[in-house]
């Protein structure tokens, strides 16, 4: 698949989201619930957040994709994630994992490894420190922010992708997406994404929306990041600072067209790391 074909797949995925409005079930953190619900809605999908063990699996059975985000952990939420993830696996529903702060505490790291070991995860999206921690390549995370990444991000992502048969995404100045064989780099985005809380979690939400309609999860993840980054570029043109940028970002995601994605996505293929 060449770059032109990739851009067309990205655009077609956005069009299918708008046409079919897939339900995306989020078991996510308190900090970003409103933002991830809105970004899911604005891209054209339908968000739902059902965290209790009494209904997490049942709700997942209705969804087109499941997000597991460990930003505000508790034992009860981990149990709900496992129940929801098992139902998703049984039903062929893609699971997208956001390992927020993996490496910052033992509990976060152990929870991520437990989820990866017990579930089939379609996509894992994190920053360089989080993915470096989980792959064994190193990396330093303070709170939920990466303060020291890995020397070779594509290689670290590839190790994790091979180990768990998943698509691994490292978001940063350039986004790396790999299934352990194919490697894509997405170059859309804007530095102001680092000034708003939850920008990574919103990226994960969009990956899940794209995965609900695009069965090649490498293409789904790269397409979501290209669309998100393009919306950020457009939003930055009219924003005056972080607060107005956040509002403009949601507006631009809402108004983004498949044609804009086909024309504006900046993606390249790399050799296997």
Curated annotation (Swiss-Prot):
Family matches, as Pfam families: HK
Family note: Belongs to the Thz kinase family.
Keywords from the UniProt entry: ATP-binding, Kinase, Magnesium, Metal-binding, Nucleotide-binding, Thiamine biosynthesis, Transferase
GO BP, one annotated term: thiamine biosynthetic process
Gene3D superfamilies in the record: 3.40.1190.20
Cofactor: Mg(2+)
MF annotations from Gene Ontology: ATP binding; hydroxyethylthiazole kinase activity; magnesium ion binding
InterPro entries registered for this protein in UniProt: Hyethyz_kinase, Ribokinase-like
Pathway annotation: Cofactor biosynthesis; thiamine diphosphate biosynthesis; 4-methyl-5-(2-phosphoethyl)-thiazole from 5-(2-hydroxyethyl)-4-methylthiazole: step 1/1
EC number: 2.7.1.50
Originating species: Desulforudis audaxviator (strain MP104C)
HAMAP family assigned: Thz_kinase
Sites where the protein binds ATP: 125, 171
Group of enzyme by EC: transferase
Annotated binding of substrate, by residue: 49, 198
Protein name: Hydroxyethylthiazole kinase
Catalytic reaction equation(s): 5-(2-hydroxyethyl)-4-methylthiazole + ATP = 4-methyl-5-(2-phosphooxyethyl)-thiazole + ADP + H(+)
The keyword DNA repair appears for this protein: no
Described purpose of this protein according to its UniProt entry: Catalyzes the phosphorylation of the hydroxyl group of 4-methyl-5-beta-hydroxyethylthiazole (THZ).
């Amino acid at each position: 698949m060449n770059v032109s074909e990739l851009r067309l797949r990205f655009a077609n995925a956005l069009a299918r989201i708008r046409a079919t409005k897939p339900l995306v079930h989020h078991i996510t953190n308190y900090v970003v619930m409103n933002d991830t619900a809105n970004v899911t809605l604005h891209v054209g999908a339908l968000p739902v957040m059902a965290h209790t063990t009494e209904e997490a699996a049942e709700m997942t059975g209705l969804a087109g994709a499941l997000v597991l985000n460990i930003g505000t952990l508790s034992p009860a939420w981990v149990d709900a994630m496992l129940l929801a993830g098992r139902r998703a696996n049984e039903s062929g529903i893609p699971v997208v994992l956001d390992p927020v702060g993996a490496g910052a505490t033992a509990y976060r790291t152990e929870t991520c490894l437990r989820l990866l070991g017990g579930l089939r995860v379609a996509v894992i999206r994190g920053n360089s420190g989080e993915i470096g921690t989980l792959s064994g390549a190193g990396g330093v995370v303070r709170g939920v922010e990466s303060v020291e990444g890995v020397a070779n991000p594509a290689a670290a992502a590839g190790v994790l992708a091979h180990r768990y048969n998943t698509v691994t995404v490292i978001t940063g100045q350039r986004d790396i997406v790999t299934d352990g064989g194919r490697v894509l780099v997405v170059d859309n985005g804007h530095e102001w994404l680092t000034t708003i809380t939850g920008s990574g979690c919103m990226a994960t939400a969009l990956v899940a929306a794209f995965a609900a309609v695009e069965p090649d999860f490498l293409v789904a993840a790269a397409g979501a990041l290209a669309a998100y980054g393009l919306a950020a570029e457009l939003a930055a043109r009219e924003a005056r600072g972080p607060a107005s940028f956040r509002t403009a970002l949601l507006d631009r995601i809402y108004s983004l067209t498949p044609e804009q994605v086909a024309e504006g996505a900046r993606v390249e293929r790399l050799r296997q790391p």
